[in-house]
Amino acid sequence: IAQCLVGSEMCIRDRFTVNAQGVCAGFPELTYLTSDAAGHVAIADYLHSLYGRYGIALTVTAQDMDTFLASRAAGGYSVTRCSFSADIDDPMPFLSLWASGAGSNCVALGRGAHADYAGYSVTLDGRTKDNCTWAESYDALLYRIQSSGDTAERYSLMHQAETLLMQTGAVCPLYWYTDTYLCNTHVQGLLSGPLGAQYLMGAHVEK
Protein backbone atom coordinates (compact mmCIF):
# COMPACT_ATOMS: atom_id res chain seq x y z
CA ILE A 1 0.00 0.00 0.00
CA ALA A 2 2.96 2.30 0.57
CA GLN A 3 3.79 1.89 -3.12
CA CYS A 4 0.18 2.75 -3.99
CA LEU A 5 0.42 5.97 -1.97
CA VAL A 6 3.68 6.90 -3.68
CA GLY A 7 2.10 6.13 -7.05
CA SER A 8 -0.87 8.35 -6.26
CA GLU A 9 1.45 11.20 -5.28
CA MET A 10 3.34 10.75 -8.57
CA CYS A 11 0.10 10.95 -10.54
CA ILE A 12 -0.92 14.15 -8.76
CA ARG A 13 2.53 15.69 -9.14
CA ASP A 14 2.99 14.79 -12.80
CA ARG A 15 -0.57 15.83 -13.71
CA PHE A 16 -1.17 13.22 -16.38
CA THR A 17 -3.82 14.28 -18.88
CA VAL A 18 -6.73 12.51 -20.54
CA ASN A 19 -7.89 13.55 -24.00
CA ALA A 20 -11.43 13.53 -25.41
CA GLN A 21 -11.04 9.88 -26.45
CA GLY A 22 -10.15 8.87 -22.89
CA VAL A 23 -6.48 8.25 -23.68
CA CYS A 24 -3.94 9.18 -20.99
CA ALA A 25 -0.67 11.01 -21.50
CA GLY A 26 2.08 10.93 -18.90
CA PHE A 27 0.61 8.10 -16.81
CA PRO A 28 3.33 6.17 -14.90
CA GLU A 29 4.25 2.80 -16.42
CA LEU A 30 2.88 -0.19 -14.49
CA THR A 31 4.14 -3.75 -14.07
CA TYR A 32 1.62 -6.58 -13.73
CA LEU A 33 3.01 -9.57 -11.83
CA THR A 34 1.38 -12.96 -12.38
CA SER A 35 2.13 -16.67 -12.23
CA ASP A 36 2.93 -18.43 -15.50
CA ALA A 37 -0.21 -20.59 -15.71
CA ALA A 38 -1.78 -20.21 -19.16
CA GLY A 39 -5.11 -18.90 -17.85
CA HIS A 40 -3.51 -16.21 -15.71
CA VAL A 41 -1.14 -15.14 -18.50
CA ALA A 42 -4.13 -14.81 -20.84
CA ILE A 43 -5.84 -12.47 -18.36
CA ALA A 44 -2.60 -10.49 -18.01
CA ASP A 45 -2.32 -10.16 -21.80
CA TYR A 46 -5.91 -8.92 -21.97
CA LEU A 47 -5.21 -6.31 -19.27
CA HIS A 48 -2.07 -5.24 -21.15
CA SER A 49 -4.20 -4.69 -24.27
CA LEU A 50 -7.02 -2.99 -22.35
CA TYR A 51 -4.74 -0.56 -20.52
CA GLY A 52 -2.95 0.17 -23.78
CA ARG A 53 -6.18 1.45 -25.31
CA TYR A 54 -6.14 4.21 -22.69
CA GLY A 55 -2.49 5.09 -23.16
CA ILE A 56 -1.27 3.25 -20.06
CA ALA A 57 1.82 1.06 -20.48
CA LEU A 58 1.35 -2.20 -18.57
CA THR A 59 4.31 -4.59 -18.67
CA VAL A 60 3.46 -8.23 -17.86
CA THR A 61 5.92 -10.25 -15.76
CA ALA A 62 5.05 -13.98 -15.56
CA GLN A 63 6.95 -16.13 -13.05
CA ASP A 64 6.81 -19.74 -11.90
CA MET A 65 4.56 -20.16 -8.88
CA ASP A 66 7.27 -20.28 -6.19
CA THR A 67 9.04 -17.21 -7.56
CA PHE A 68 5.72 -15.40 -8.04
CA LEU A 69 4.64 -15.98 -4.43
CA ALA A 70 8.01 -14.77 -3.13
CA SER A 71 7.93 -11.67 -5.36
CA ARG A 72 4.39 -10.85 -4.33
CA ALA A 73 5.16 -11.28 -0.62
CA ALA A 74 8.12 -8.93 -1.02
CA GLY A 75 5.95 -6.28 -2.68
CA GLY A 76 7.85 -6.51 -5.97
CA TYR A 77 5.06 -5.26 -8.22
CA SER A 78 2.83 -2.31 -9.05
CA VAL A 79 -0.17 -4.54 -9.83
CA THR A 80 -0.48 -8.26 -9.15
CA ARG A 81 -3.03 -11.03 -9.20
CA CYS A 82 -4.43 -12.67 -6.09
CA SER A 83 -6.91 -15.52 -5.84
CA PHE A 84 -8.82 -17.24 -3.08
CA SER A 85 -11.50 -19.90 -2.76
CA ALA A 86 -13.84 -19.82 0.25
CA ASP A 87 -14.98 -22.99 1.97
CA ILE A 88 -18.28 -21.63 3.30
CA ASP A 89 -21.15 -19.68 1.75
CA ASP A 90 -20.43 -16.37 3.49
CA PRO A 91 -18.59 -13.13 2.58
CA MET A 92 -16.33 -13.27 5.64
CA PRO A 93 -13.65 -15.60 4.21
CA PHE A 94 -13.04 -13.01 1.50
CA LEU A 95 -13.25 -9.96 3.76
CA SER A 96 -10.89 -11.58 6.27
CA LEU A 97 -8.17 -11.76 3.61
CA TRP A 98 -7.44 -8.08 4.13
CA ALA A 99 -7.29 -7.89 7.94
CA SER A 100 -4.09 -6.29 9.22
CA GLY A 101 -2.68 -9.53 10.57
CA ALA A 102 -3.86 -11.88 7.81
CA GLY A 103 -1.14 -13.84 6.05
CA SER A 104 -3.13 -13.50 2.82
CA ASN A 105 -2.99 -9.68 3.03
CA CYS A 106 -0.45 -9.40 0.20
CA VAL A 107 -0.94 -5.64 -0.24
CA ALA A 108 -0.07 -5.08 3.45
CA LEU A 109 -3.16 -3.07 4.38
CA GLY A 110 -2.78 -1.98 8.00
CA ARG A 111 0.90 -2.92 8.08
CA GLY A 112 4.21 -1.15 7.54
CA ALA A 113 3.82 2.38 6.20
CA HIS A 114 0.04 1.93 6.07
CA ALA A 115 -0.36 1.01 9.75
CA ASP A 116 -0.42 4.63 10.94
CA TYR A 117 -2.42 6.04 8.04
CA ALA A 118 -5.59 7.47 9.64
CA GLY A 119 -7.85 8.24 6.71
CA TYR A 120 -10.83 5.95 7.23
CA SER A 121 -14.26 6.32 8.81
CA VAL A 122 -16.26 3.64 10.57
CA THR A 123 -19.80 3.53 11.95
CA LEU A 124 -20.52 1.26 14.90
CA ASP A 125 -23.53 1.38 17.22
CA GLY A 126 -24.88 4.36 15.29
CA ARG A 127 -21.79 6.48 15.92
CA THR A 128 -19.38 7.46 13.16
CA LYS A 129 -15.70 7.89 13.94
CA ASP A 130 -13.40 9.59 11.44
CA ASN A 131 -9.62 9.62 11.06
CA CYS A 132 -9.29 5.94 11.87
CA THR A 133 -6.43 3.61 10.99
CA TRP A 134 -7.06 0.34 9.15
CA ALA A 135 -7.00 -1.52 12.47
CA GLU A 136 -9.46 0.93 14.05
CA SER A 137 -11.87 0.71 11.12
CA TYR A 138 -11.64 -2.43 9.00
CA ASP A 139 -10.30 -4.76 11.68
CA ALA A 140 -12.84 -3.40 14.17
CA LEU A 141 -15.66 -4.13 11.72
CA LEU A 142 -14.44 -7.69 11.19
CA TYR A 143 -14.26 -8.28 14.94
CA ARG A 144 -17.84 -7.06 15.37
CA ILE A 145 -19.07 -9.18 12.44
CA GLN A 146 -17.43 -12.31 13.83
CA SER A 147 -18.95 -11.78 17.27
CA SER A 148 -22.47 -10.93 16.05
CA GLY A 149 -25.28 -13.45 15.77
CA ASP A 150 -27.64 -10.97 14.09
CA THR A 151 -27.82 -11.63 10.33
CA ALA A 152 -29.05 -8.13 9.43
CA GLU A 153 -26.31 -6.51 11.51
CA ARG A 154 -23.64 -8.78 10.05
CA TYR A 155 -24.56 -7.96 6.46
CA SER A 156 -24.79 -4.25 7.16
CA LEU A 157 -21.31 -4.30 8.70
CA MET A 158 -19.95 -6.50 5.91
CA HIS A 159 -21.20 -4.00 3.32
CA GLN A 160 -19.43 -1.26 5.28
CA ALA A 161 -16.20 -3.29 5.36
CA GLU A 162 -16.49 -3.96 1.63
CA THR A 163 -16.91 -0.23 0.96
CA LEU A 164 -13.79 0.54 3.01
CA LEU A 165 -11.82 -2.07 1.09
CA MET A 166 -12.92 -0.74 -2.30
CA GLN A 167 -12.09 2.83 -1.26
CA THR A 168 -8.43 1.89 -0.86
CA GLY A 169 -8.15 1.08 -4.55
CA ALA A 170 -5.85 -1.77 -3.53
CA VAL A 171 -8.23 -4.52 -4.66
CA CYS A 172 -10.04 -4.89 -7.99
CA PRO A 173 -12.15 -8.05 -8.40
CA LEU A 174 -11.95 -9.45 -11.94
CA TYR A 175 -13.84 -12.72 -12.20
CA TRP A 176 -14.75 -15.95 -10.46
CA TYR A 177 -12.29 -18.22 -12.18
CA THR A 178 -13.12 -21.38 -10.21
CA ASP A 179 -16.61 -21.47 -11.76
CA THR A 180 -16.23 -20.57 -15.43
CA TYR A 181 -18.74 -21.57 -18.08
CA LEU A 182 -20.12 -20.37 -21.39
CA CYS A 183 -23.82 -19.65 -21.70
CA ASN A 184 -25.64 -18.71 -24.91
CA THR A 185 -27.38 -15.34 -24.60
CA HIS A 186 -30.65 -17.05 -25.56
CA VAL A 187 -30.54 -19.10 -22.33
CA GLN A 188 -32.23 -17.25 -19.48
CA GLY A 189 -32.91 -18.15 -15.85
CA LEU A 190 -29.75 -20.17 -15.25
CA LEU A 191 -28.55 -19.74 -11.68
CA SER A 192 -25.04 -20.44 -10.43
CA GLY A 193 -24.73 -20.94 -6.67
CA PRO A 194 -21.84 -19.50 -4.65
CA LEU A 195 -20.43 -22.98 -4.05
CA GLY A 196 -20.40 -23.89 -7.75
CA ALA A 197 -23.72 -25.72 -8.21
CA GLN A 198 -25.73 -24.93 -11.35
CA TYR A 199 -29.51 -24.65 -10.93
CA LEU A 200 -31.44 -25.45 -14.10
CA MET A 201 -35.03 -25.52 -12.78
CA GLY A 202 -35.73 -21.99 -14.04
CA ALA A 203 -33.62 -22.17 -17.19
CA HIS A 204 -35.34 -21.62 -20.53
CA VAL A 205 -34.51 -20.56 -24.07
CA GLU A 206 -35.63 -17.20 -25.43
CA LYS A 207 -35.27 -16.26 -29.10
What are the residue ranges of the model-derived segments?
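Sec-exported extracytoplasmic/periplasmic mature domains
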Residues: H48-I56, A73-Y77, S85, A99-G103, ...
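Stable alpha-helical elements in mature extracytoplasmic
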Residues: S8-E9, G39-I43, L47-L50, D64, ...
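Short, solvent-exposed loop/beta-turn-alpha elements that line the ligand-binding surface or hinge
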Residues: S8, R15-G26, S71-G75, S96-Y143, ...
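A short hydrophobic/aromatic micro-motif that marks alpha-helical segments and, especially, helix-coil
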Residues: P93, D116, L164-M166
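Extended amphipathic secondary-structure runs
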Residues: T31-A37, V41, R144, S148-D150, ...
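Ligand/substrate-recognition segments at binding pockets and active sites
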Residues: R13-D87, T151, T178-D179
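Short catalytic/ligand-binding loop motif for oxyanion handling, primarily in non-cytosolic enzymes
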Residues: I88-P91, C183
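Single conserved hydrophobic/aromatic residue that forms the stacking wall/gate
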Residues: I1-G7, C11-I12
